[in-house]
Amino acid sequence: RRAVATTDPKTGCIYLSNELRGKFLTKVLLHELGHCAIFSFDLLDDIHRMVLPKYWFEAEEWVCNFIADYGESIFGVAYSILGEDAWALIPYELEKLIA
């Protein structure tokens, strides 16, 4: 099986396949941004504290899949509440998140 994306935990650099398009690209990017958030906020130790070692990998992937599956909906709700201000706030908050 071939990976469509990966994130370097040391640099936070996301590598995406050139073949990704549309909704799948969005989902994969959100998933990888989840990894960036985990690395940036040093959350891996928190995940490791909460699950048995044999589930560490699966737990990290679950968190990133949650972000990929529900991130757009969450941002959509933010937009419905904040209106146009959401588009100013969300990129700023994302930048802080992965910086």
Model-identified regions with their sequence ranges:
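Active-site scaffold of zinc-dependent metalloenzymes
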Residues: 1-25, 36-45, 56-60, 69
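Compositionally biased, non-globular sequence tracts
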Residues: 25, 55, 92, 97-99
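Walker B catalytic acidic pair
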Residues: 32
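Intrinsically disordered, low-complexity segments enriched in glycine/proline and serine/threonine
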Residues: 35, 63, 96-99
